[in-house]
């Protein structure tokens, strides 16, 4: 638990430095089922216990439509943390692979997944979406943009989505993969 406490301290610092959470916010964590999003969920759950700006926490998973995905462990973790959990069923897999037959599906899939998340959240009045991007992801995005696009670019700690009114927040930007690997789920 000590590693989670130290990690939560980094998350808190990032949240405060970029004013990511306001009193009364409901923060939805986009949970893929991978370690990054699960650790973020755990850290924000811990943070809400003592953070001076009270906020509610929810978890949401976009089901892309692939067979064999089991989100039971995610549901169990959410229940143990007292966090409401929603599974959003989509046909993203069908659109990306069967209709569009994308050769490089990652970008389209990511955009569609974020669009589905933001639309679902704005329909419920939730204006904050926490994503599990960390420092190493930011560096990788910066380098890929430089090499493949010839420009200096990276995602921001807070990104406002004008169409839906949802703010995407990235509270783990002060922590890298090495710090994440110390936390046991």
Describe each model-derived feature in a short phrase.
Residues 1-143, 148-151, 178-179:
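ATP-dependent adenylation/nucleotidyltransferase module used to activate substrates
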Residues 154-175:
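Short, flexible loop segments at boundaries between secondary-structure elements
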Residues 183-185:
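Conserved small/polar residues in nucleotide/adenosyl-binding loops
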């Amino acid at each position: 638990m000590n590693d989670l406490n130290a990690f939560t301290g980094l998350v808190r610092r990032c949240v405060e430095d970029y004013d990511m959470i306001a009193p009364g916010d409901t923060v939805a964590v986009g949970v893929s089922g991978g370690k990054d999003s699960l650790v973020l969920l755990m850290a924000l759950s811990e943070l809400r216990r003592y953070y001076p700006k009270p906020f509610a926490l929810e978890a949401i998973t976009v089901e892309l439509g692939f067979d064999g995905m089991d989100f039971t462990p995610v549901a169990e973790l959410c229940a143990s943390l007292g966090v409401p959990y929603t599974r959003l069923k989509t046909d993203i897999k069908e659109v990306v692979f069967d209709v569009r037959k994308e050769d490089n599906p990652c970008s389209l899939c990511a955009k569609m997944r974020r669009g589905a998340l933001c639309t679902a959240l704005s329909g419920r009045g939730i204006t904050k979406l926490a994503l599990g991007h960390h420092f190493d992801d930011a560096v990788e995005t910066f380098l890929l943009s430089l090499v493949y696009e010839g420009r200096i670019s990276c995602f921001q700690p807070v990104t406002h989505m004008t169409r839906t009114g949802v703010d995407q927040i990235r509270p783990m930007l002060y922590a890298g993969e090495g710090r994440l690997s110390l936390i046991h789920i």
